[in-house]
């Protein structure tokens, strides 16, 4: 046969429109913007090749393996409606290309190399279909939605949280006091800001101690289970684990991690520890906009959210929907369902390119956080439903009477909305009225609404 060296078009090997996808394949939907003069088939095939077995030229060692068994295949290409020179390229990867239980390896393979590719002007990973066979190699969230409700003994409503502000500069003692006031007022959780790690003005161990004190004091006074997301993110994995272990020794219910800056390897280790030791894990998505903000390049957040469900986390920040554009609402709800449900049907109107079956992987609670206020409560309750965490930072701490009354205002607004919904009222239409009625018997809420 003889070995034939030389450069040949990717599409001869990697563009296979007749390919029938297997149940075990990992499927990817890429938004491809080819350079001028590059046909879309070649661009799609180039992505499939470079993210699997291909390189820029035919190599002698190709003969020592079965390319047909291991190569990625671009099996379908469609133009993006309303965009010039943009295509969705669907790529199927054989399962054997990936290490079991490693989100890190999955991303290194699929997005590690292709994004700097010359033939492409831009590239965005829009969605992934994770096959059941691969899902089963992951532990996933340490506990999941149902176990969390049982641990906290809170049912039939969204959970309430608050990020402690000012995020940097408070001493540990004052920080603990702010935590206590919010929890005492009626919140379920308070939160370390994502950039609170262990800085000179507040070392992590001091913060953990004072926050634990705040938790136990507020629990004793309210008769409710309380928590504070203690941020265990650190410069090394060993230090991160040390912080998580200390949190467990204090007996607190939940810790926190920045999963993109901390990295998937660290996150998965922490998630395993949390399941083994009964800690809930709150995940913050700091740095996500660097990756997901551009419409034509990067990775869509729904992929990062799927990856987090595999790596492990019980809560993850997922945007707020409120006050944003209408179109974003459906897209956001699409990945909120991807986080919570066992089975999600393909639905392009919500940005879901593939049907995803999570089998028995626990669900993740979406966290709505950022610029929300008591007036948003009816909309948030309606949009996110019971299985969510609503976080009001400035919306709690910005109350004219202080933190505890701010917490009271949020809790009253939430309970009023849940009750109204259970009585069959339409939160979307009557939301403002429901809040106004509640103001009559809650001076704290009335003050917050002024």
From Swiss-Prot:
<dbReference type="InterPro" id="IPR017443">
    <property type="entry name" value="RuBisCO_lsu_fd_N"/>
</dbReference>
<keyword id="KW-0488">Methylation</keyword>
<feature type="binding site">
    <location>
        <position position="317"/>
    </location>
    <ligand>
        <name>substrate</name>
    </ligand>
</feature>
<comment type="function">
    <text>RuBisCO catalyzes two reactions: the carboxylation of D-ribulose 1,5-bisphosphate, the primary event in carbon dioxide fixation, as well as the oxidative fragmentation of the pentose substrate in the photorespiration process. Both reactions occur simultaneously and in competition at the same active site.</text>
</comment>
<dbReference type="Pfam" id="PF00016">
    <property type="entry name" value="RuBisCO_large"/>
</dbReference>
<feature type="binding site">
    <location>
        <position position="163"/>
    </location>
    <ligand>
        <name>substrate</name>
    </ligand>
</feature>
<dbReference type="InterPro" id="IPR000685">
    <property type="entry name" value="RuBisCO_lsu_C"/>
</dbReference>
<feature type="modified residue" description="N6,N6,N6-trimethyllysine">
    <location>
        <position position="4"/>
    </location>
</feature>
<keyword id="KW-0456">Lyase</keyword>
<feature type="active site" description="Proton acceptor">
    <location>
        <position position="284"/>
    </location>
</feature>
<feature type="modified residue" description="N6-carboxylysine">
    <location>
        <position position="191"/>
    </location>
</feature>
<keyword id="KW-0120">Carbon dioxide fixation</keyword>
<dbReference type="InterPro" id="IPR020888">
    <property type="entry name" value="RuBisCO_lsuI"/>
</dbReference>
<feature type="active site" description="Proton acceptor">
    <location>
        <position position="165"/>
    </location>
</feature>
<keyword id="KW-0602">Photosynthesis</keyword>
<keyword id="KW-0150">Chloroplast</keyword>
<dbReference type="Pfam" id="PF02788">
    <property type="entry name" value="RuBisCO_large_N"/>
</dbReference>
<dbReference type="GO" id="GO:0009853">
    <property type="term" value="P:photorespiration"/>
</dbReference>
<dbReference type="InterPro" id="IPR020878">
    <property type="entry name" value="RuBisCo_large_chain_AS"/>
</dbReference>
<keyword id="KW-1015">Disulfide bond</keyword>
<keyword id="KW-0601">Photorespiration</keyword>
<dbReference type="GO" id="GO:0019253">
    <property type="term" value="P:reductive pentose-phosphate cycle"/>
</dbReference>
<comment type="similarity">
    <text>Belongs to the RuBisCO large chain family. Type I subfamily.</text>
</comment>
<dbReference type="InterPro" id="IPR036376">
    <property type="entry name" value="RuBisCO_lsu_C_sf"/>
</dbReference>
<feature type="binding site">
    <location>
        <position position="193"/>
    </location>
    <ligand>
        <name>Mg(2+)</name>
    </ligand>
</feature>
<comment type="subunit">
    <text>Heterohexadecamer of 8 large chains and 8 small chains; disulfide-linked. The disulfide link is formed within the large subunit homodimers.</text>
</comment>
<feature type="binding site">
    <location>
        <position position="194"/>
    </location>
    <ligand>
        <name>Mg(2+)</name>
    </ligand>
</feature>
<protein>
    <recommendedName>
        <fullName>Ribulose bisphosphate carboxylase large chain</fullName>
        <ecNumber>4.1.1.39</ecNumber>
    </recommendedName>
</protein>
<keyword id="KW-0113">Calvin cycle</keyword>
<feature type="binding site">
    <location>
        <position position="285"/>
    </location>
    <ligand>
        <name>substrate</name>
    </ligand>
</feature>
<feature type="binding site" description="in homodimeric partner">
    <location>
        <position position="113"/>
    </location>
    <ligand>
        <name>substrate</name>
    </ligand>
</feature>
<dbReference type="GO" id="GO:0000287">
    <property type="term" value="F:magnesium ion binding"/>
</dbReference>
<dbReference type="GO" id="GO:0016984">
    <property type="term" value="F:ribulose-bisphosphate carboxylase activity"/>
</dbReference>
<keyword id="KW-0560">Oxidoreductase</keyword>
<keyword id="KW-0479">Metal-binding</keyword>
<feature type="binding site">
    <location>
        <position position="369"/>
    </location>
    <ligand>
        <name>substrate</name>
    </ligand>
</feature>
<keyword id="KW-0934">Plastid</keyword>
<keyword id="KW-0460">Magnesium</keyword>
<feature type="binding site" description="via carbamate group">
    <location>
        <position position="191"/>
    </location>
    <ligand>
        <name>Mg(2+)</name>
    </ligand>
</feature>
<dbReference type="InterPro" id="IPR036422">
    <property type="entry name" value="RuBisCO_lsu_N_sf"/>
</dbReference>
<dbReference type="GO" id="GO:0009507">
    <property type="term" value="C:chloroplast"/>
</dbReference>
<feature type="site" description="Transition state stabilizer">
    <location>
        <position position="324"/>
    </location>
</feature>
